[in-house]
Amino acid sequence: MKHIVFITNPISGTISKAGIPELVEVHLDHARFSYEFVSTQYAGHATLLAQEAAASGADIVCAIGGDGTVNEVGRGLLGTETAMAILPCGSGNGLARHLMLPMDLKRCLDIINLDTVETLDSGVINGHPFFCTCGMGFDAFISMKFAEAGKRGLMTYVEQMLREGLSYKPETYEIEDEMGSKTYKAFLISAANASQYGNNAYIAPHASMSDGLLDVIIMQPFSLIEAPQVTLEMLNKTIDKNVNIRTFKARHVHIHRSKPGLIHYDGDPLMSDADVEIEVKPKSICVVVNPHADEAARQPNMMQTAASELFYNMDRIRTQITRQGRNIQATNLKLLRKLNLK
């Protein structure tokens, strides 16, 4: 019989956890699993609890909470044979959604009962492990504002994005990987081990947790009129088609910026040095996965692709009109000068 330790963060996420012990008692397969519950008492406690569970021989440690709790539990299980399971109770649930776990907790317990475990990749940014995404720029800035807001949920995140997006200033970054070095002015830079931030906002639709690579996304500055397009393309899984997006895969990247600033790992913000090291750790964590997950569901469908193409063509037409307008203005200016009218 296998043993599961359920780690619950009583204050994380947007879902009450009061009924979860009863749900586990009713729906967990008791012929296959014994279990116990432990609760976190402070930030970082889930990592210690997960380490203790793994050291005592637990077969599975289940994180009950949001991406922050999942990150803490995952950190405690890196390099062990103890698998991490997830009962998603957060505001974004990025890793659970990437793994195509249902948001219904009973159905998640059904998946735990199937006991399908895979060894997947993780990442590290300046010494901090992550499992979904890490980055700097606007998303790290919003992660800080979100943490300061005092309330969770998608609407809080959107509110912070709308409030801060108009005034945020892009930075210049020098990015070096195995292929060389380039300099970009960017709104944000994200390194993705998994495909989304959470709430089905796909920053890296093609990211895989089993390819030994990170998807690096460089979002270059864009205009206010383009902001709705960027949002829609993230939800449509077509952000990689946007003309302001540059993507590549890498095992390791070194990023230099002009001064220290914010970074984030799985949505947790912190101040860091001007130099940032990001690397993948292949096959570093065992995870209970959904054996019925359809990988194709992470890719855009025909309607989503068509919407992306429409936006792309509109953007191209707008660019051409702008360029033609500038050419006409330049021609008119030359003509006026020849006529000594200007």
Residue ranges of model-derived segments:
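ATP/NTP phosphate-donor binding region
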Residues: 1-60, 294, 304-315, 326, ...
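Glycine-rich beta-strand-to-loop/alpha-helix junction loops that act as flexible
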Residues: 10, 64-66, 89
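ATP/nucleoside-binding phosphotransfer catalytic cores, i.e., glycine-rich phosphate-binding loops
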Residues: 17, 218-342
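Catalytic core of DAGKc-family lipid kinases
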Residues: 31, 79-83, 87-191
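Short glycine/serine/threonine-rich phosphate/pyrophosphate-binding segments
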Residues: 46, 68-73
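Short hydrophobic-aromatic micro-motifs
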Residues: 128-134, 183-192, 197-198, 215-218, ...
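Internal anion-binding site segments
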Residues: 177-178, 185-250
